């Protein structure tokens, strides 16, 4: 079990890290070209709006996994193929309908959700046109999500993990060679091409499983109906990050449109670590949990859950603390060039500080949500999703006038903490989850190792900044120095404290 989690997670992490490196270059070029100006706000708003609808399609990945796993565990290969074909056809038709409706409503969407942009007729026209182009991407999301889910169930992680890398390469190539020629509107076309490639990259791996697509349209299919019944709570929960950010974008735009860009870059930084590590672990763990539930192996199920949370904490607790200490040089290295000034970097790093806790919060919350999906308990998921949306608005909206744009990050973080706790206790009751003394001892060891790491990193950072200015070159240097020292000290501390999960990872690497 632990070998499956580690081996699969490593594959996903490698591709995700490569994707994020390309994404950082992409965002850096975007910041250099547009800074925190209106064109960047228009692109960010359009992309955020598109991703909100795209996340609906991504819910299909989680919806199909338990249904497919149950059929597969009963050796019903033909029924598995029929389920996939029918789901692809039906979901793609519905996606096309959504695209038509979204294109028609692009104007009102901009007026309601980006009022500051809509006040200028030229910017309004740009935003509407860009939004309509990007909405076409949604057509490719449904088949892409379904194929990715099937491949994950069959422990084929390379193609699904490489999707983001492929699309980010498209965006980077466009920015380097074509942005000055075709501008923001051409970027919208590049986004559509990127989503098509994300679908196409899964097709060869899917065909190697022996499956072939055949047109099938049967709304009465039992498997499809099962997916349909669970889809709304799954889609709502898988869209929570996008919905919450959309609410925050609307609140931020009502005060200052440039806060949209600050929110976007801060979110991208926190999401980078969340996606590289937590998504990698959870992508592997979720099919495993669904399979164990289908086989009624609840002892191993609870073991896999606890093990996954430990792996997340081992990696992301020190990462979160390190990012909090080095937030200014990190954002300077990431963004400070061209139109993006040091003042903008300071503003963004201040905002980032309040968003950093969401790295851990979202990671743990994600694995808890996937537990409820695998247990087919969508009622709790639905309640938690609604609570997240409501609390995001209730907490953030009153704060915006009192503490400015940082209220967006604070509201987002507080909402995450409350809703994570709301997930833990029902799950504890449902599967009789017990955290024993050894688990608590391991957690304490991870915290101690993180403290041991953070003190010298903080001292090195302060020593460096007392002698050198934080330009882009020096920022990269201090990140490298602190990063190397931090990783070495943390690993030595973990090994000295005898954290079992570290021994497991080392043994697996030795035996490869």
Where are these regions (language model features)?
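Interhelical loop/hinge segments that connect adjacent transmembrane helices in multipass membrane
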Residues: 1-5, 203-241, 299, 429-447
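Short membrane-interface helical motifs at transmembrane helix boundaries
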Residues: 99-121, 321-341, 459-463
